Amino acid sequence: MIFSKISQVAHYVPQQLVTNNDLASIMDTSHEWIFSRTGIAERHISRDEMTSDLAIQVADQLLTQSGLKADAIDFIIVATISPDATMPSTAAKVQAAIAATSAFAFDMTAACSGFVFALAMADKLIASGAYQNGMVIGAETLSKLVNWQDRATAVLFGDGAGGVLLEASKDKHVLAEPLHTDGARCQSLISGETSLSSPYSIGKKAIATIQMDGRAIFDFAIRDVSKSILTLMAQSDITKDDIDYCLLHQANRRILDKIARKIDVPREKFLENMMRYGNTSAASIPILLSEAVQKGQIRLDGTQKILLSGFGGGLTWGSLIVKI
């Protein structure tokens, strides 16, 4: 049988740094108010780079690190809720920029679960035997979706991109995965609505910026994500002691605190970087993974078991246990 493995990781964030104190100068908030509720101290905000620009930086790094030629890449998946445009896809722009002429490319929209969903799909593509090498990138410029007069959401989000190179392997590396969607709760977190605009249609007011029921999302993350992770471990015969690190979507430090207690895994196994990047949606997990590899916490030698778990709009949530 053919399986997939993560062979390279990379990330990139815009240079411009916006601190909580910077935000306090343009809205009614403070560093103490933001940090005590979220664990976020600063975030990177793009000045002139689009989502595709961030993703291209990651793709270039992955190619350089791997030594592969661009025409060896079979597919590119970009997980994003903030594409440059509805058409063409962000992934198509990445494919063109790196001259991956043999690759097919598409975007995936699953909000903050996007990277996990995309990685699960990419694993199946390689397992089919039809493809050998693929890129999975999470990239966001959420700053363009934020209402900068709404302190409840404006303080949360940042821009960035991270990604992995997947290669075919004789050994199984994606050990377990449950993916979930509950569209009945979709109104808890919305952004980028469009309205009918033809002369034959009745239009309605569309909500363009991020709107969130914070309490509902907080409760969802604690309840549903924790339950999913516990079920995942039970069904896969992988115990909490087998997990080396937990890389969860970087939405809120208090969410990580509560999930750690719920699943009874030591808090120190939960890596975090939301204090420096904020919530970067589909980019948060691959950025965290790339930084952990840079720091030597994750070795990419196939000896560690890592829990990846995303959750967000849709509502969507999903987890993978990956040998890496």
Curated annotation (Swiss-Prot):
Residue numbers annotated as active site: 112, 249, 279
Main location: cytoplasm
Record-listed E.C. numbers: 2.3.1.180
Alphabetized Pfam families for the sequence: ACP_syn_III, ACP_syn_III_C
Location in the cell: Cytoplasm
Protein keywords: Acyltransferase, Cytoplasm, Fatty acid biosynthesis, Fatty acid metabolism, Lipid biosynthesis, Lipid metabolism, Multifunctional enzyme, Transferase
Pathway: Lipid metabolism; fatty acid biosynthesis
Domain of life: Bacteria
Stretches for region ACP-binding: 250-254
InterPro entries: ACP_syn_III_C (IPR013747), ACP_syn_III_N (IPR013751), FabH (IPR004655), Thiolase-like (IPR016039)
Enzyme class: transferase
Swiss-Prot/TrEMBL GO biological process terms: fatty acid biosynthetic process
UniProt note: domains: The last Arg residue of the ACP-binding site is essential for the weak association between ACP/AcpP and FabH.
Annotated family: Belongs to the thiolase-like superfamily. FabH family.
Subunit relationships: Homodimer.
Protein name: Beta-ketoacyl-[acyl-carrier-protein] synthase III
Organism of origin: Streptococcus pyogenes serotype M49 (strain NZ131)
